[in-house]
Amino acid sequence: MNVKGRVVLSMLLVSTVMVVFWEYINSPEGSLFWIYQSKNPEVGSSAQRGWWFPSWFNNGTHSYHEEEDAIGNEKEQRKEDNRGELPLVDWFNPEKRPEVVTITRWKAPVVWEGTYNRAVLDNYYAKQKITVGLTVFAVGRYIEHYLEEFLISANTYFMVGHKVIFYIMVDDISRMPLIELGPLRSFKVFEIKSEKRWQDISMMRMKTIGEHILAHIQHEVDFLFCMDVDQVFQNNFGVETLGQSVAQLQAWWYKAHPDEFTYERRKESAAYIPFGQGDFYYHAAIFGGTPTQVLNITQECFKGILQDKENDIEAEWHDESHLNKYFLLNKPTKILSPEYCWDYHIGMSVDIRIVKIAWQKKEYNLVRNNI
């Protein structure tokens, strides 16, 4: 074969490889896995400093790499459309669970198994082509003890059938477990600064989540959940949980009177809630909503945390105390029953039909730097 023929053949081979690769990464079998070392995302900048590399899983996710601009445009158009949520009467029937509280005094639904029609909701949100984000933090020994099981279970049960982005915050990227992703799923991993005290790790996540929402998350997802890593999904956590602002009932306190709640009772704290006030006790292990609402939650909670630091006081249950104060003043539009975050140490209540997420064993002596 002459030189010209070899050149033509080489060009054909290269073109074929490029076409095959392009088709692969734009198929459900192509998976991309982002890692970012930027500790502080540049607010207002769409360009994230970092890098991505392909991670070829058997059941990978659709590639978002070439779609980010299109997704951003689609999100903006969706905002302009100003589509509302599906009317409550179309998917929610509080009378199906008369033995528990299913409607708050401000008319927000409390979602229990049996009260919702997931098929109707899945069909509604599928037409909107929603993307749901999930943030999770794993610092220090929490990575080895909890992160892999959390991600594997979330991959199986979180928002099945809908596009999902997992935002994983770790202090050591080299210890990040590689997980086989299901269809429509992708990871974005960010390296964050570790704190000396576990209390500060817990409270600083509010600041970090807010920064990432402003920098990029608000352009990438329609709804966002923030969850603790020391829990595991056991059943479908689906679109019945989506709402403008979503709070989780704390399993140990869902039947208690507000005066029994472990609210912050010291007036000096920004999280102070006096006796005689309060609706429910909310668990900081799960909260969510639209990016705008979650941004407001995290900013207001962090503002309270900073105010407490200036006054040399720390709320009794740290970020959770501030979250409860926030939801007292800004009522959640949807509340999740304890089925969505159950502790088996309580035993099995007749109220709990299906456990969606379960607490993991709290091995604080092994995972926390200071007790």
UniProtKB/Swiss-Prot annotation:
Give the EC class as a word. Answer: transferase
Q: Name one GO biological process term.
A: protein glycosylation
Q: Name one GO cellular component term.
A: vesicle
Cofactor: binding details: Binds 1 Mn(2+) ion per subunit.
- Which segments sit on the Lumenal face? 23-371
Identify the glycosylated residues: N59, N296
Sorted alphabetically, which PANTHER family does this protein's record hold? GLYCOSYLTRANSFERASE-RELATED, N-ACETYLLACTOSAMINIDE ALPHA-1,3-GALACTOSYLTRANSFERASE
Q: What is this protein called?
A: N-acetyllactosaminide alpha-1,3-galactosyltransferase
Say which species the protein is native to: Sus scrofa (Pig)
